[in-house]
Regions:
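Extended, compositionally biased flexible segments
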Residues: 52-86, 95-119, 127
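Short, low-complexity cationic-aromatic patches
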Residues: 76-78, 94-106, 138-145, 215, ...
């Protein structure tokens, strides 16, 4: 009791350091750590930067990660906390081993043609194709008569975060899927022959597979959409809790607004939209625009945390 007769307040539990077992009787007990409701929820993580990545210059060959791991504070390559985007550029007539430590990786062929070979399946690919590869250690890419440029997004950071490994082929939740440019154009023609409602966010082609059709995803956690914008239009501002990685496929005088910042498109640029950021896409040009978007949306749909909302009418 103080001189004035009042009782001293106990220290705030938020100021307690991390606690250990007082007298552990085993190695398992010694590994226990304890926090409290005053200090357990004040972990400060770096924000996900909104950033644009350019494709590799002509004549530069190899795998080019769109890596923000330093800004994100993680010790593995990552574009967003759970996704990694990359470019792969190959010289004509060369081959590249491509191990994939992911549940699945989405690919888009920007230029050139070649052959993809896995352990049990393979196919020829050409510019404009989309394909999905389940995680595996033994893929090989072969470029044919011209240089090849590909864009890919997978969930490698998600597996690295939990030190996980791709499932064995018989247990994998996804299969190899190949969507040719011709089939994609057929699907676009069908979409543009139909009407839309006020609640539809533009005209976009959503990719899925036989195994993931019920969820409308391409992998359990990744969604892929091929969005379009007519000339002199914009996609209404909106937000969602998934992060988004966008490839600018087609369009002149196009830009995105992300958290109030104008992000001009350049050919084949990769744009990062942070989770929760208000954003919109704009086409001020005279021709239609197209852009591919990969999100970790499957994860949020499953967790009921997508939080999608339009921010304008």
């Amino acid at each position: 009791m103080s001189a004035s007769g009042s009782v001293a307040e106990p220290p705030d539990m938020a100021d307690l350091p991390m606690q250990h077992a007082q007298a552990p009787a085993s190695a398992a007990q010694s590994r226990a750590r304890f926090f409290n409701s005053g200090n357990a929820f004040n972990v400060k993580l770096p924000v996900v930067p909104a950033r644009a990545f350019a494709p590799p210059a002509a004549g530069c060959y190899g795998v080019f990660d769109c890596d923000q791991s330093a800004a994100l504070g993680c010790d593995f390559p990552a574009t967003t906390p759970l996704m990694l985007a990359r470019y792969v550029q190959m010289a004509a007539g060369t081959s590249l081993a491509m191990p994939l430590r992911a549940t699945g990786v989405v690919w888009y062929v920007i230029a050139g043609d070649g052959h993809l070979q896995g352990a049990s399946e393979g196919f020829d690919f050409a510019a404009g194709d989309v394909f999905l590869l389940p995680g595996a250690p033994d893929y090989r890419l072969d470029a044919k008569g011209a240089d090849v440029l590909l864009w890919a997004v997978g969930n490698e950071p998600q597996l690295a975060f939990e030190q996980g490994r791709p499932a064995a082929p018989d247990d994998a939740p996804v299969d190899l899927v190949h969507c040719t440019a011709e089939e994609i154009e057929r699907q676009f023609a069908l979409i543009f022959s139909m009407g839309t409602s006020d609640e539809t966010s533009g005209r976009a082609l959503i990719f899925s597979s036989e195994r993931q059709a019920a969820a409308r995803n391409l992998t359990p956690t990744l969604t892929l959409s091929f969005n379009t914008l007519e000339p002199h239009t914009h996609q209404r501002a909106h937000r969602h809790n998934s992060a988004a990685i966008t490839l600018a496929v087609q369009g002149t005088r196009c830009h995105s607004m992300v958290d109030g910042v104008r992000c001009p498109w350049t050919p084949w640029a990769t744009l990062v939209t942070p989770p929760g950021a208000p954003h919109s896409h704009h086409n001020e040009g005279e021709a239609g625009a197209r852009f591919l978007i990969v999100q970790d949306g499957g994860l949020h749909y499953h967790a009921r945390t997508m939080g999608f909302e339009f921010l304008e009418r």
